[in-house]
Design a protein with these regions (language model features):
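Non-catalytic, structured segments within soluble enzyme domains
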Residues: 1-62, 220-223, 234, 238-239, ...
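A generic secondary-structure signal for well-formed alpha-helical elements
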Residues: 9-20, 162, 166-170, 216, ...
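Acidic/histidine-enriched alpha-helical segments
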Residues: 21-34, 175-180, 281-292
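Glycine- and acidic
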Residues: 112, 137-146, 214-218, 245-252, ...
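Active/ligand-binding-proximal structured segments within catalytic/core domains
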Residues: 140-162
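Conserved catalytic neighborhood of penicillin-recognizing serine enzymes
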Residues: 168-231, 277, 289-314, 318-319
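Mid-domain, small-residue-enriched loop/turn segments at the edges of structured enzyme/sensor domains
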Residues: 188-193, 225-266, 275, 279-282
Length: 375
């Protein structure tokens, strides 16, 4: 499974996502960054990366003056850079010989999408596949545990499961209009919606998750929050194994917080395991050189939800895959297995998430554009 996961990540990046990202950024003055930042901000990001590079620290340790170090980054130099290469019917990663300035090589490296993938056995917690990126030798940044990104709509199943635990059902109806929620400071928050269907009509809570509807989600947030605070939802996320710092804002229901792939995978086991959350297990046993077992390890299990609340959430997440935002997975790859899932995008599609689970496997995939947070 590990080999398949690594190959699939490289294949999808090299053949589909990276070319699309390159076309999107082509001709933009601030490429590979968003045009929402100024050229001065872009230069600051690059300058910071220069001072965090191995070349900079090596020259500084050798006693080279600061001015000379910085000047060296603008001199064309022979080097090897990361690239995708076609090999038969698939793609591989390689190092390509070239000549460019070290500063340009930093910008070049930031044009490549980052990614992280993890799969674990939902029943035992054993990690089956772990891919921290397309090539760790080049991008020494683990997007499974180190990299945290805004989770967007993949946070919604947590809110909906919390609602199920509070007595709501997938069949409960509400008027599909834009909600207006009051923040603690008295200001009004009115979330936008990506779609325009069913406006002014009665819809179900299950319909809201199936179509990743922001208005239904925000309405639920209002029902579960008090005085504009979402402390109860924050506490619930922590009970699901999320250790990241989370601000208790109303917009949290739409995924404004940063969470890691590892945290997401562990939390999603709750829905397929009748409300019991499994912690990821990386090592099952230790043996000495003679083959004697020194220690055995098992995953820690936490009861998060009553079984009926977990089942109601599971039902809604199945619908996401059967006819909602995740249904393309079935049509494109011809998968008819029983599964649930959730998609999520954030920050003008700079981050893309896909959560999916079967009765025995929980997975999370993240694709993300280069970010100043990685610099």
């Amino acid at each position: 499974m590990q080999e398949h996961a690594e190959a699939a990540m490289i294949e999808h990046l090299a053949s589909t996502l990276q070319p699309a990202f390159d076309r999107e950024k082509s001709g933009r003055a601030n490429a590979p960054f968003s045009n929402s930042i100024t050229s001065q901000e872009r230069d600051k990001i690059i300058d910071r990366s220069v001072r965090q590079s191995g070349r900079y620290f090596t020259m500084r340790a050798a006693g080279v003056p600061e001015e000379e170090i910085i000047a060296s980054f603008d001199k064309p130099t022979e080097m090897q850079v990361f690239a995708y290469e076609r090999s038969g019917d698939s793609y591989i990663t390689t190092l390509r010989d070239t000549v460019m300035t070290p500063r340009d090589s930093i910008i070049y490296a930031k044009t490549f999408l980052r990614s992280g993938f993890m799969a674990m056995d939902s029943e035992t917690g054993e990690v089956r596949a772990y891919v921290g990126g397309p090539d760790f030798l080049t991008f020494k940044y683990d997007m499974v545990t180190q990299g945290r990104r805004q989770v967007g709509s993949t946070i919604k199943p947590y809110l909906y499961s919390m609602a199920m635990n509070e007595g709501f059902t997938p069949c409960d109806q509400l008027l599909h209009v834009q909600p207006a929620l009051r923040n603690p400071d008295g200001s009004i928050w009115t979330p936008r919606n990506a779609g325009s269907s069913m406006i002014g009509e009665m819809v179900s809570i299950g319909w809201g998750l199936k179509h990743s509807d922001n208005w239904v989600t925000a309405w639920l947030m209002g029902q579960l929050s008090s005085d504009g605070y979402s402390n109860s939802f924050v506490n619930y996320l922590h009970s699901m194994g999320v250790t990241s710092t989370i601000e208790p804002t109303l917009a949290l229901c739409l995924g404004s917080c940063d969470i890691s792939v590892e945290e997401m995978v562990g939390a999603f086991t709750t829905f397929s395991q009748k409300g019991m959350r499994q912690e990821p297990l990386y090592v099952t046993k230790i043996v000495d050189k003679y083959g004697n077992v020194v220690a055995n390890f098992t995953s820690k299990v936490h009861e998060v939800l009553p079984e009926d609340a977990a089942y109601k959430t599971l039902y809604m997440m199945r619908e996401v895959m059967n006819g909602g935002t995740g249904s393309r997975m079935r049509f494109r790859y011809g998968i008819d297995a029983d599964m649930g899932g959730k998609t999520g995008t954030t920050q003008n599609h700079s981050d893309g998430w896909f959560m999916c689970f079967t009765p025995k496997l929980s997975t999370c995939l993240l694709y993300t554009s280069p970010s100043p947070r990685d610099s």
